[in-house]
From Swiss-Prot:
Name of the top EC class for this enzyme: hydrolase
This protein's name: Deoxyuridine 5'-triphosphate nucleotidohydrolase
Catalytic activity: dUTP + H2O = dUMP + diphosphate + H(+)
EC numbers for this chain: 3.6.1.23
Family classification: Belongs to the dUTPase family.
InterPro entries tied to this protein: dUTPase, dUTPase-like, dUTPase-like_sf, dUTPase_trimeric
GO molecular function per UniProt: dUTP diphosphatase activity; magnesium ion binding
Binding site for substrate: R72, S73, G74, N85, L89, I90, D91, M99
Function in brief: This enzyme is involved in nucleotide metabolism: it produces dUMP, the immediate precursor of thymidine nucleotides and it decreases the intracellular concentration of dUTP so that uracil cannot be incorporated into DNA.
């Protein structure tokens, strides 16, 4: 995979020490943290959603990869802060600002502060199969057309 290009859209990211280019928290981290590129604290009311900019654009280029914006586990578990779209899928050819839909699913207001780590970005491989229209499948699987709950709970 070639290098992923990152374009700084907001000068705060390079000029303000509270902000920074995204990094991995540890050597074993799969994703990089995305920070809230806001000027002042933002109160997200219980049950509300807000679209928050990151001040960054990312261009993957290689169609065999995509970006995924995922929630941070601590924010979700401790504060009920998750993504409004649950997972953000960023196509390889997208060049606009990375935006994060933040949803406060808790019963209490949440204050998002400038430069707070609010989500994570992971680059993943993408399978790009050809699709063949058929009238019948060539094999019958053990599952067949069994849908929601067909295998039980235990």
């Amino acid at each position: 995979m070639q290098a992923v290009q990152v374009k700084v859209l907001n000068p705060k990211i390079t000029e303000d020490k509270a902000f920074s280019l995204p990094t991995r928290a540890t050597d074993g981290s799969a994703g990089i943290d995305l920070r809230a590129c806001i000027d002042e604290p933002l109160t997200i009311k219980a049950g509300a959603t807000h679209l928050i900019g990151t001040g960054l654009a990312v261009y993957i280029q290689d169609p065999n990869f995509a970006g995924m914006i995922l929630p941070r586990s601590g924010l979700g578990h401790k504060h009920g802060i998750v993504l409004g779209n649950l997972v953000g899928l960023i196509d390889a050819d997208y060049q606009g600002e990375l935006m994060v839909s933040i949803w406060n699913r808790s019963q209490e207001d949440f204050v998002l502060t400038p430069a707070e780590r609010m989500a994570q970005y992971v680059v993943v491989p993408v399978a790009r199969p050809e699709f063949e229209v058929v009238t019948e499948f060539s094999d019958t699987s053990a599952r067949g057309a069994g849908g929601f709950g067909h295998s039980g709970r235990q």
